[in-house]
């Protein structure tokens, strides 16, 4: 196929990959865009797109002195978060999607979406965005190409992925790639005026696991539209991982170095908005300890030649929740944004062209423009920034970025943490007995709801196995089987699994543990447990730290609060048993025998504790 066969293509196609060119030509015929542009990932391209989006009213250029080369986008109020009810796993067999996913027959879904896609890019530019998951130097890279009519998405992907010419070169003339289609679903007829944030009330976020395709329609927001993020890095990658013998997980990756210079690496799975980014960017309060971030959201875990599990961050940027981020809770995130080059979405705008959100340092300004574009004062009875408002910034700007984030081999994982928001029941930190016990603990992870999903009822408890509930690309029971299989393969070289809970509350509702930088004290105990240097108390859930096992020097939290935070009350665990049993039943017949056996053992421990 020649370049001429792609109507509207600007200039020559920078590739001879016939499969790619044919696919683009088919997409042009379907979407009917006005122009087709290959994104090259250059600074010139970023600057040009930014200027165009400022002119269109999609972006607001922020104060150049305070936020150089940074922009604010305000989305349509109907398009502010992931939409789980419109997210589909379209496997050939419904059973392969399992009980936790919405399923539709792939052929029927493709026919349905083809109709909404038809002509959906009229009057718009279709961008061809080649990207690489993880470091571009990987000899066996996972590649993708997204076709999108959103320049905001292209700008976001330049931050979030290794995108552009280098990725296209990596695909080469016959390389394989995951095909990602995205349209905001807002065609422009001739003479029709555009809106600042085009989207459609009808939304689809669809994954096809057998063919490794992603089709998205109707949303311009984050994870619905930046298809390299949750759609590829977790939903499609988890399917690849099961087929190829690795794991794609919703985990941060943290490098910790002790005063002796020994480095350790921790991967941690928490549900969205439960503190992954804060932990990934932790500033340890214990003297002599150093923390560096490898990733804050997604980890791909693979065995290397030495038989150990290594973690790679497939992303290149942070897409962090803004509200609550400040110089006390997460100084590293704030410092990462200081050099600029940041895309903000749905935060508030100050009168001098800076940004603001709830929980930022200092008092709220006397006047703001809120995320909907309206005047706001401290007397206003609604938040100035949307609870799920975001900042998007490159990892390389982070002052504590570990150099290993650019190493395709990744880092050896010494410990895995699971954790959510539980006001009671779950102690501050516990080591599980072994990999199978840890898998069961992860399978029964439950947390309070957050605003990261558009449909969440905030505060209610929801089960979230391994923090992967919205992101498993296949049957949840088979996903847990992959955990068991990985443990069997790795044997005694597998990392230890721990359960943490920063959010225990006292009877009066106060937090019992100060959290944030003080969590380094818990991480030190985790490392000391791995090295066999510190004790623990056996509780119903595992080996739980005692107050005297933690390094509490210089901490002014009452010792009684810490002791209470470390309890694992058998009666509270007993109260969860029925709910947990029902949940394992809900997950279906493919849940591994080992998980059921571990749950039965937990029940026996709880009954024995209650009897004594």
UniProtKB/Swiss-Prot annotation:
Its cofactor is Mn(2+). Pathway: Carbohydrate biosynthesis; gluconeogenesis. SUPFAM superfamilies: PEP carboxykinase N-terminal domain, PEP carboxykinase-like. Binds 1 Mn(2+) ion per subunit. Mn(2+) binds at residues 230, 250, 297. One of its GO terms (molecular function) is phosphoenolpyruvate carboxykinase (GTP) activity. It is found in: Cytoplasm. GO terms for biological process: cellular response to glucose stimulus; gluconeogenesis; glycerol biosynthetic process from pyruvate; oxaloacetate metabolic process; propionate catabolic process; response to lipid; response to starvation. Its EC number is 4.1.1.32. Keywords: Cytoplasm, Decarboxylase, Gluconeogenesis, GTP-binding, Lyase, Manganese, Metal-binding, Nucleotide-binding. Substrate binds at residues 82, 221-223, 272, 388-390. It catalyses: oxaloacetate + GTP = phosphoenolpyruvate + GDP + CO2. The active site is at 274. GTP binds at residues 273-278, 390, 421, 516-519. One of its GO terms (cellular component) is cytosol. Pfam families: PEPCK_GTP, PEPCK_N. Belongs to the phosphoenolpyruvate carboxykinase [GTP] family. HAMAP family: PEPCK_GTP. Catalyzes the conversion of oxaloacetate (OAA) to phosphoenolpyruvate (PEP), the rate-limiting step in the metabolic pathway that produces glucose from lactate and other precursors derived from the citric acid cycle. Monomer. This is Phosphoenolpyruvate carboxykinase [GTP]. It comes from Corynebacterium efficiens (strain DSM 44549 / YS-314 / AJ 12310 / JCM 11189 / NBRC 100395). The gene is pckG.
């Amino acid at each position: 196929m020649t370049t001429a066969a792609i109507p509207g293509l600007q200039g020559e196609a920078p590739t001879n990959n016939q499969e790619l060119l044919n696919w683009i030509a088919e997409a042009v015929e379907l979407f009917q865009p006005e122009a087709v542009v290959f994104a090259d990932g250059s600074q010139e391209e970023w600057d040009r797109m930014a200027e165009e989006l400022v002119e269109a009213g999609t972006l607001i250029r922020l104060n150049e002195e305070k936020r150089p080369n940074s922009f604010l986008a305000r989305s349509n109020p109907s398009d502010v978060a992931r939409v789980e009810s419109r997210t589909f796993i379209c496997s050939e067999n419904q059973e392969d999607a399992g009980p936790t996913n919405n399923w539709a027959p792939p052929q029927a879904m493709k026919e349905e979406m083809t109709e909404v896609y038809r002509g959906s890019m009229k009057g718009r530019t279709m961008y061809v965005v080649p990207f690489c998951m993880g470091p571009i130097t990987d000899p066996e890279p996972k590649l993708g190409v997204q076709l999108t009519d959103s320049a905001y998405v292209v700008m976001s992907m330049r931050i979030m992925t290794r995108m552009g010419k280098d990725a296209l070169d990596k695909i080469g003339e016959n390389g394989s790639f995951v095909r990602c289609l995205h349209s905001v679903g807002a065609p422009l007829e001739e003479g029709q005026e555009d809106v600042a944030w085009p989207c459609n009330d009808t939304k689809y976020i669809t994954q096809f696991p057998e063919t490794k395709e992603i089709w998205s329609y109707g949303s311009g927001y984050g994870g619905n539209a930046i298809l390299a993020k949750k759609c590829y890095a977790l939903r499609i990658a988890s399917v690849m991982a099961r087929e190829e013998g690795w794991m794609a997980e919703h985990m941060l990756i943290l490098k910790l170095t002790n005063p002796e210079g020994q480095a350790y690496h921790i991967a941690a799975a928490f549900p969205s908005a439960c503190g992954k980014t804060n932990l990934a960017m932790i500033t340890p309060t214990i003297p002599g300890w150093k923390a560096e971030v490898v990733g804050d959201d997604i980890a791909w875990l693979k065995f290397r030649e030495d038989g150990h599990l290594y973690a790679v961050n497939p992303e290149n940027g942070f897409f962090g929740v803004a509200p609550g981020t400040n110089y006390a809770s997460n100084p590293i995130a704030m410092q990462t944004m200081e050099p600029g080059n940041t895309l903000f979405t749905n935060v508030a705008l100050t009168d001098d062209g800076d940004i603001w959100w709830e929980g930022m340092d200092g008092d709220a300004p006397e006047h703001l423009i809120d995320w909907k574009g309206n005047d706001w004062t401290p007397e206003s009875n609604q938040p100035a920034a949307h609870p799920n408002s975001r900042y998007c910034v490159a990892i390389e700007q982070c002052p504590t970025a570990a150099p290993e984030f650019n190493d395709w081999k990744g880092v050896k994982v010494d410990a895995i943490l699971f954790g959510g928001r539980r006001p009671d029941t779950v102690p501050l930190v516990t080591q599980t007995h072994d990999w199978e016990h840890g898998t069961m603990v992860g399978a029964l992870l439950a947390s309070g709801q957050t605003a990261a999903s558009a449909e969440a009822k905030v505060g209610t408890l929801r089960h979230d196995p391994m923090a992967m509930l919205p992101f498993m690309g296949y049957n949840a029971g088979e996903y847990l089987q992959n955990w068991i299989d990985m443990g069997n393969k790795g044997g005694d070289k597998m990392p230890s699994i721990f359960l943490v809970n920063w959010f225990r509350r006292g009877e009066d509702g106060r937090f019992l543990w100060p959290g944030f930088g003080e969590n380094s004290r818990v991480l030190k105990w985790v490392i000391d447990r791995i090295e066999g240097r510190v004790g623990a108390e056996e509780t119903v859930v595992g080996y739980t730290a005692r107050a005297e096992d933690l390094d509490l020097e210089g901490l002014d939290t009452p010792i009684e609060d810490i002791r209470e935070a470390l309890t694992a009350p058998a009666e509270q665990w007993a109260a969860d048993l029925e709910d947990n049993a029902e949940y394992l039943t809900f997950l279906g017949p493919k849940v591994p025998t080992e998980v059921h056996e571990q749950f039965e053992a937990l029940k026996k421990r709880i009954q024995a504790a209650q009897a004594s």
